[in-house]
């Protein structure tokens, strides 16, 4: 095992347009880091640079104490698991897992020991003589992970390994990945576009957007204190409500575009007259009968079983409130909603960055 360090790493294919803007990252020995973001944000490119499949434009990559920036992938001490399983269809499970070791010149007994140990960890012993066509999607992905495990790498790299699986199997494989990491404690860098995977697997999350690491933090930090409007809108399902407006001169009221006002229970006079974006998560909005509640006309109600989502408008801007499964107001009715002060987030509308009271 080893730590992973990226120092001022950038990537540009034409020397002009940056695909990856300067990123610095320190991954501790045994840490599980997940990079999450939309398609085209640069997360897979960054992973491929760590693997050596892409060259960095500037900056350095270290695995342990070794600078690996210019080393070939085979010399970096990494193992990679891809979205497609990349199994040899004519080989059985044992030979698929053993093939890389045979190429590297390992002896038969050493290969057998490593494959047997990986098969035990992944519960693949009964399947070692089967061909890939005889396996389910989840079993094939476990074989792909086993092929990586037998290499005993310093760093595991995962490139959206669960994307080809159905929803139920993804849940199962997430649990298996968590258990696998607890057993092996190998430094891991994992790429996904699925925020649920990111939040459930990661010890720390890197939220990527247009080649920039918008925020690096624990899942709790990213959820509770998003560093930017992008992070606030990307993490959470449904996403955080974001309302553009202006703070009144005395800092006591947030004024939306059509003049609707939301009282700020904790006045912020230092923001008086400033254009800001107010954020609050749907699950933090409370329905109330009190006069302090802000009225919202209910446009539609989504029944999700465990809870319900109430959709409406405030100041011409969409708002979603998560209600309990017992609350089933009729479309067209008026809800009175309360925004707890501790649940409010504020962002500079122009820069998109979080600001603190």
Swiss-Prot record:
Pfam families assigned: ABC_tran, OB_MalK
One of the record's GO cellular component terms: ATP-binding cassette (ABC) transporter complex, substrate-binding subunit-containing
Residues involved in ATP binding: 37-44
Top-tier EC class: translocase
Domain of life: Bacteria
Protein EC: 7.6.2.10
InterPro entries the record matches: AAA+_ATPase, ABC_transporter-like_ATP-bd, ABC_transporter-like_CS, ABC_transpr_MalK-like, ABC_transpr_MalK/UgpC-like, Mo/tungstate-bd_C_term_dom, NA-bd_OB-fold, OB_MalK-like
Main localisation: membrane
Signal peptide from the UniProt entry: none
GO biological process, one term: glycerophosphodiester transmembrane transport
Compartments where found: Cell inner membrane
Protein's UniProt name: sn-glycerol-3-phosphate import ATP-binding protein UgpC
Organism: Yersinia pseudotuberculosis serotype I (strain IP32953)
């Amino acid at each position: 095992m080893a730590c992973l360090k990226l120092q001022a790493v950038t990537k540009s294919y034409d020397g002009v347009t940056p695909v990856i803007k300067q990123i610095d990252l320190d991954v501790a020995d045994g840490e599980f880091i997940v990079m999450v973001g939309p398609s085209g944000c640069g997360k897979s490119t960054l992973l491929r640079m760590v693997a050596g499949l892409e060259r960095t434009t500037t900056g350095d990559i270290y695995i342990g104490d070794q600078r690996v920036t210019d080393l070939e992938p085979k010399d970096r001490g990494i193992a990679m698991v891809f979205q497609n399983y990349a199994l040899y269809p004519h080989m059985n499970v044992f030979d698929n897992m053993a093939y890389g070791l045979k190429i590297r010149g390992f002896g038969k007994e050493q290969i057998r020991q490593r494959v047997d140990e990986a098969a035990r960890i992944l519960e693949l012993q009964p399947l070692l003589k089967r061909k890939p066509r005889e396996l389910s999607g989840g079993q094939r992905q476990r074989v792909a992970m086993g092929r990586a495990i037998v290499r005993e790498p310093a760093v595991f790299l995962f490139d959206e390994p669960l994307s080809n699986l159905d929803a139920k199997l993804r849940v199962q494989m997430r649990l298996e990945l968590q258990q696998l990491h607890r057993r092996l404690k190998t430094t891991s860098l994992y790429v996904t576009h699925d925020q649920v995977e990111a939040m459930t697997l990661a010890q720390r999350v890197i939220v990527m957007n247009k080649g920039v690491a918008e925020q690096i933090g624990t899942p709790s930090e990213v959820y509770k204190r998003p560093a930017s409007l992008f992070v606030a809108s990307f993490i959470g399902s449904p996403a955080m409500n974001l309302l553009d407006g202006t703070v009144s001169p005395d800092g006591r009221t947030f004024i939306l575009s059509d003049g609707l006002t939301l009282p700020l229970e904790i006045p912020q006079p230092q923001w008086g007259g400033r254009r800001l974006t107010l954020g609050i998560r749907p699950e933090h909005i409370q329905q109330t009968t009190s006069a302090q509640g802000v009225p919202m006309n209910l446009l539609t109600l989504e029944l999700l079983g465990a809870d319900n989502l109430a959709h409406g408008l405030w100041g011409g801007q969409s708002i979603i409130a998560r209600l309990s499964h017992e609350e089933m107001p009729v479309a067209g009715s008026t809800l009175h909603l309360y925004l707890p002060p501790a649940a409010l987030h504020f962002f500079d509308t122009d820069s998109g960055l979080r600001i603190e009271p």
